[in-house]
């Protein structure tokens, strides 16, 4: 029986989402479509009468801005927002800034799918010569984390994301849910996928099939042990949501005209 409710979502669309590039830890902002997605998400949650007590985000602009816009639509701007690098997107290492379709042409669609969706596969690490290395690691936000700068990842599998996310879930988010607080998590695609895997008990093999579209709220109903009661639910127009999921899946494929 459901005892608690939790809402999570992947942030609204950013410029590099639109350009089909691996964004990861590069701090891209929402584009015009992403801004509207965030507002629509807020309207959807308002129509369902959600009242939040606490919001958790990553320390990436696109997830924070998404949360702000949702709270604005809800008229709940006063709700506390807490941000942590542990909710950041997966670190895609050397793949950061590269075009997914071009990578599929160069390395094959299955390899790109493994890099994007599998549990254990880690992309090649980012090197200091990478054009975005210094932009990431010289950013002040990473100098005030709860781990030293030199211990932050240079590349991650989804397994790595779950391992760095779980302490934050266990120590900060879960206790608030257990206190009866209504919590919103505005994060990234892979941090949300990792948390879904943990809460729903999704297998290492099955997680490759879980895709999250941008800007769509996900409802999780949890029991007293904070395990899901039934599968997660996408809130909104289901036909549009399925089309958005397909769009994300197709990002790692070669367009037919190029085959």
Swiss-Prot record:
Catalytic activity of the protein: (2R)-3-phospho-glyceroyl phosphate = (2R)-2,3-bisphosphoglycerate + H(+); (2R)-2-phosphoglycerate = (2R)-3-phosphoglycerate
Task of the protein: Plays a major role in regulating hemoglobin oxygen affinity by controlling the levels of its allosteric effector 2,3-bisphosphoglycerate (2,3-BPG). Also exhibits mutase (EC 5.4.2.11) activity.
SMART domains: PGAM (SM00855)
EC number: 5.4.2.4, 5.4.2.11
Family under the similarity heading: Belongs to the phosphoglycerate mutase family. BPG-dependent PGAM subfamily.
Active site residues of this protein: 11, 89
Enzyme class name: isomerase
Modified residues (Phosphothreonine): 122
Modification sites for N-acetylserine: 2
UniProt cross-references to Gene3D superfamilies, sorted A to Z: Phosphoglycerate mutase-like
Activity regulation field: At alkaline pH BPGM favors the synthase reaction; however, at lower pH the phosphatase reaction is dominant. Inhibited by citrate.
Coiled coil: none
Record lineage: Eukaryota, Metazoa, Chordata, Craniata, Vertebrata
Biological process annotations from GO: glycolytic process
Pfam family, one: His_Phos_1
Domain of life: Eukaryota
Keyword Isomerase on entry: yes
Residues that bind substrate: 10-17, 23-24, 62, 89-92, 100, 116-117, 189-190
The protein, known as: Bisphosphoglycerate mutase
Keywords from the named record: Acetylation, Glycolysis, Hydrolase, Isomerase, Phosphoprotein
Keyword rRNA-binding: no
Gene Ontology molecular-function annotations: bisphosphoglycerate mutase activity; hydrolase activity; phosphoglycerate mutase activity
């Amino acid at each position: 029986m459901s005892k608690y409710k939790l809402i999570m979502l992947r942030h609204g669309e950013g410029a590099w989402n639109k350009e089909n590039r691996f964004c990861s830890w590069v701090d891209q902002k929402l584009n015009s479509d992403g801004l509207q997605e965030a507002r629509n998400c807020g309207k959807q949650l308002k129509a369902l009468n959600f009242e939040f007590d606490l919001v958790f985000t990553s320390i990436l602009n696109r997830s924070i801005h998404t949360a702000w816009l949702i709270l604005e639509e809800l008229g709940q701007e006063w709700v506390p927002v807490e941000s942590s690098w542990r909710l950041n997107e997966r670190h895609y290492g050397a793949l950061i800034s590269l075009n997914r379709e071009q990578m599929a042409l160069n390395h094959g669609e299955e390899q790109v799918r493994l890099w994007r969706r599998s549990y254990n596969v880690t992309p090649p690490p980012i090197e200091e010569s990478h054009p975005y290395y210094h932009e990431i690691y010289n950013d002040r936000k990473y100098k005030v984390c709860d781990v030293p700068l030199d211990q932050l990842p240079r590349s991650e599998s989804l397994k790595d994301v779950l391992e760095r996310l779980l302490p934050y879930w266990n120590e900060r988010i879960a206790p608030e849910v257990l206190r009866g607080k209504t919590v919103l998590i505005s994060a990234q695609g892979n941090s949300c996928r990792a948390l879904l895997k943990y809460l729903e008990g999704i297998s290492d093999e099955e997680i490759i099939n879980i895709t999250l579209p941008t800007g769509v709220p996900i409802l999780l109903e949890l029991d007293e042990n904070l395990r899901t009661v039934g599968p997660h639910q996408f809130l909104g127009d289901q036909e549009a949501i399925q089309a958005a999921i397909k769009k994300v899946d197709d990002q790692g494929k070669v367009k037919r005209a190029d085959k």
